Swiss-Prot record:
Lineage of producing organism: Archaea, Thermoproteota, Thermoprotei, Sulfolobales, Sulfolobaceae
UniProt pathway annotation: Isoprenoid biosynthesis; isopentenyl diphosphate biosynthesis via mevalonate pathway; isopentenyl diphosphate from (R)-mevalonate: step 2/3
Protein name, as recorded: Phosphomevalonate kinase
GO biological processes: farnesyl diphosphate biosynthetic process, mevalonate pathway; isopentenyl diphosphate biosynthetic process, mevalonate pathway
Family: Belongs to the GHMP kinase family.
Function: Catalyzes the phosphorylation of (R)-mevalonate 5-phosphate (MVAP) to (R)-mevalonate 5-diphosphate (MVAPP). Functions in the mevalonate (MVA) pathway leading to isopentenyl diphosphate (IPP), a key precursor for the biosynthesis of isoprenoid compounds such as archaeal membrane lipids.
Annotated EC: 2.7.4.2
């Protein structure tokens, strides 16, 4: 039996700006999607058991995007296998996604499993390219691919590709280390693709481009300081970049990324010892991320307000569990 797993993610530097070619840092976390594959007697079949249902020979949109990519790019698809594709429980709470990147982790995990069945090894760059193609087509070109890259390579500095076939992305491994990290799930899911599309619609405006340039400058400086182990100083640049982002969202795009309740949760977290708290990824309401040396007081304060706490730790990228 082959078994692989891929991590969830937290995009805390580069939200939205990464879509337009800006630099980002994404943290791979220890909530994972596992995929296992074993041979069956039906040699012309693929049977899927997943967190979202059971399928034969084709599946949901995610599964089909991966299968189609294998047919198009490799001209072959392994047959005669039963496949289990399951999320850790924290990806979905009460039927709602928590923003940890279950779709990207599942795409990478399934891609890796099928690739291993064909080649008997894991080639991270080939798996990354196949998973990016499947994800890109499924999202109809919206998105930057940071989540797929992190699910393969772990915690990384990332700049998106400009060409899907060339896959001319930039990445650099950058682990944060042993900080206390958590997500506070607010109980509602955001619609990431819809939010990103609204930003794309305004992206040709001069004001939009100028403020995105300022955001990217702050993000570059934050990442430079993180590399020097100066997280306290980096946080100030992250916060300023966030102020610019909220300005674009509200004044130019016409959306509010952080609700009053989320603003209150961020304020509480920073008063109770978090080095930084923010709405990760595309924002829009699903979770608030907090990072610090000791977040116990934050956990207590958020829990009192009915927020579901998801403790996370930095984790590695795509992993072969057994073969």
């Amino acid at each position: 039996m082959i078994k692989v797993s891929a991590p969830g993610k937290i995009l805390w530097i580069g939200s939205y700006s990464v879509v337009f070619g800006g630099i980002s840092h994404v943290i791979a976390v220890n909530k994972r999607v596992s995929c296992s594959l074993r041979e069956i007697k039906e040699k012309d079949s693929l049977i899927f058991h997943t967190s979202y249902g059971h399928f034969k020979n084709s599946g949901n949109e995610l599964i089909n995007s991966v299968l189609d990519t294998f047919r198009e790019r490799l001209s072959q698809l392994p047959q005669g296998y039963e496949i289990d594709l399951y999320n850790d429980k924290e990806f979905i709470i009460d039927g709602k996604k928590t923003g940890l990147g279950s779709s990207s982790a599942a795409t990478v995990s399934l891609t890796a499993c099928l690739y291993y069945a064909i080649h008997g090894k894991l080639d991270l760059f080939e798996i990354h390219k196949l998973a990016q193609i499947a994800n890109y087509k499924r999202q109809k070109g919206i998105g930057s691919g940071f989540d797929i890259a992190s699910a393969v390579f772990g915690s990384i500095v990332y700049k998106r590709f400009t060409d899907l076939d060339k896959m001319d992305f930039y990445f650099e491994k950058l682990n944060l280390g042993n900080y206390d990290m958590m997500l506070g799930f607010t109980g509602k899911s955001s619609e990431t693709v819809g939010l990103v599309r609204k930003f794309v619609e305004k992206s040709n405006l001069d004001d939009f481009k100028e403020i995105m340039r300022l955001i990217d400058e702050e993000n570059y400086m934050a990442i430079k300081l993180i590399k020097l182990n100066k997280l306290d100083e980096a946080v100030e640049h992250i916060k300023l970049g966030r102020k610019y982002l909220n300005y674009i969202a509200e004044r130019i795009v016409g959306v509010k990324l952080v609700s009053k309740m989320e603003e209150e949760l961020i304020k509480i977290a920073e008063e109770e010892g978090a080095l930084v708290a923010l709405s990760p990824g595309a924002g829009g309401g699903d979770s608030i991320f907090a990072l610090g040396n000791d977040l116990n007081r934050v956990r207590e304060a958020w829990s009192k307000r009915g927020i579901f706490i998801i403790d996370v730790k930095e984790d590695e990228g795509l992993r072969l569990e057994s073969n």
